[in-house]
Amino acid sequence: MALITVKNVSFYYEKNMVVENLSFEVNAGDYLCVVGENGSGKSTLIKGLLRLKQPESGEIAIGDGLKANEVGYLPQQTAAQKDFPGGVYEVVLSGRLSSRGIRPFYTAKDKQIAKENMELLNISDLANRCYRELSGGQQQRVLLARALCATRKLILLDEPVSGLDPLVTQEFYGTVAQLNRNANITVIMVSHDIQSAVKYATHILHLQNEQAFFGKTEEYLRTTLAKSFIGGAENV
C-alpha cells in the first residue's frame, strides 16, 4: 500500500479554485519533486498533505503504517525564524514534540534520536551553538535534522534552498538524496529549481492549477511540457 494516496483532490481559497483534480501516489522510497510556476498550487498541496488544509473535494489517505504525526516537515524559513535565539540541540530536539504527546518532558529516547540525527547530518559539533549565528546552509541542516526527529519514513520540504548560494544549494540537495537512497527516507519536495529536481527526483508532479503531469522523471523529460519549462528556467 502507498504511503500517501491522493484521489480526485481539489483545493479552494474563499471559493476560488487553487488546484484541482489531483490524483497520485507516493510509495516508500520515492523522491517526488513538485514543480510549477508561482501560484500553481504547490504550497497548498503541501498544506493538504500535512492536514493543515482540508480539500474541497476528493481524498488524501495515508497507509503502509504511516501515522499522521510521523511526517517530518521542513517549511520555507521566514526572517524571524532565521533569527531564532535558541540553541541548535534545542531546535533539533523540538522535532520530537509530536511524539511527546502530553508528557511535560523529553524522554531519553527523544534525546537519543535527536543526537543520532545530528550525527547523521554531521552537525554534532554545532550542538551548543546559537541557531541564529549559523550560516544559511548550517541552519537548513539543523532544520532537516529536526524534521527527521519526527519520522523515519517521510519528509516534506517546501522550497528548502530558498536564499542559499549555489554551492550550498547543491550540497543540500546531495544530502537529501543520500537520505533517500541510504536511509530509505521518502521525500516530497516543492522546488522552483527544475534542474536539480530532474537530477535527483525519481518522480515529478507538475502543477498548473491542475495536474499537468505525474510520473517518473525519465518520462517527464520526454514531454513537451518539461522541455518548455526547463528551457524557460534556464533563461531566467
PLM region spans:
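Catalytic Walker B motif of ABC-type/P-loop ATPase nucleotide-binding domains
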Residues: I155-D158
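H-loop (His-switch) and adjacent beta-strand-loop-beta switch element
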Residues: I204-K216
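Conserved ABC ATPase "signature" region
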Residues: L93, A108-L126
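Conserved ABC transporter NBD signature motif
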Residues: G58-N69
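Conserved ABC ATPase signature
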Residues: C130-L134, Q138
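H-loop/switch region of ABC-family ATPase nucleotide-binding domains
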Residues: S191-H192
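Helix N-cap at the start of a conserved alpha-helix in ABC-type nucleotide-binding domains
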Residues: P166-V168
